[in-house]
Amino acid sequence: EELLLNDLCPDMKYCCEDLLMKKQVSFLPGDAETVSFPTESTLITSCSALQWFESPENFFERCNTLLNNQGYFAFSTFGKENMKEIRELTGNGLPYRSREELEVALSPHFDILYSEEELIPLSFEDPIKVLYHLKQTGVNGLSTQSSPTGKQENDLCSSDNNSKNNFKNNLPQQQWTRRDLQLFCERYTQEFTQGASVSLT
């Protein structure tokens, strides 16, 4: 048995050095939509990456050709409700697909054995803490061109990683003025306060 790890960033290999010490484990950097993966695989799995892909639909078809007849494809990704609060206030965000859309895209290539969607609302002391959380948790699909006052212009398992232009860890406040940030916080507090905190989906 062999395990092949993949990430868009080559430096991620340093985060799994302990695994790579085993001879049956290897690391292949590159774009998961185009990199050459081995055929006749028994399992392809992806965690929180498909939302960055140019075409998840094409990737699903590709995975089908890479798996053996008894192979499995399992992944988790984010749905349409992800960071909806930020999207409503800035008009910016990734084009997330719904669970139903993903199932439709999977159906021509796989028998869907399991599908589930979960909403996990988070609570923060104030909107500044929300922005800090987004910065600390990595890429988020927010552009430095977002306006704080502008309006808007899931787990699956099947039987048988990116939108490269958006792959940046830039929070919008990098080009916001102090007034912009103040307006964002005021609107966020007004629209998304729950009890003594503000929410983020």
What are these regions (language model features)?
Residues 1-35:
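Class I SAM-dependent methyltransferase SAM/SAH-binding core
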Residues 11-12, 59, 82:
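Conserved short alpha-helix immediately C-terminal to the canonical SAM/SAH-binding motif I
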Residues 33-44:
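A short acidic, Gly/Pro-enriched loop at the edge of an enzyme's catalytic core
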Residues 38, 97, 114-201:
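Conserved Class I S-adenosyl-L-methionine
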Residues 42-57, 77:
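A short SAM/SAH-binding and catalytic strip from SAM-dependent methyltransferases
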Residues 57-72:
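A short glycine-rich, Lys/Arg-flanked "PGG" loop and its adjoining helix->strand segment in the class I
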Residues 72-101:
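Conserved class I S-adenosyl-L-methionine
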Residues 95-110, 183:
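Short alpha-helix
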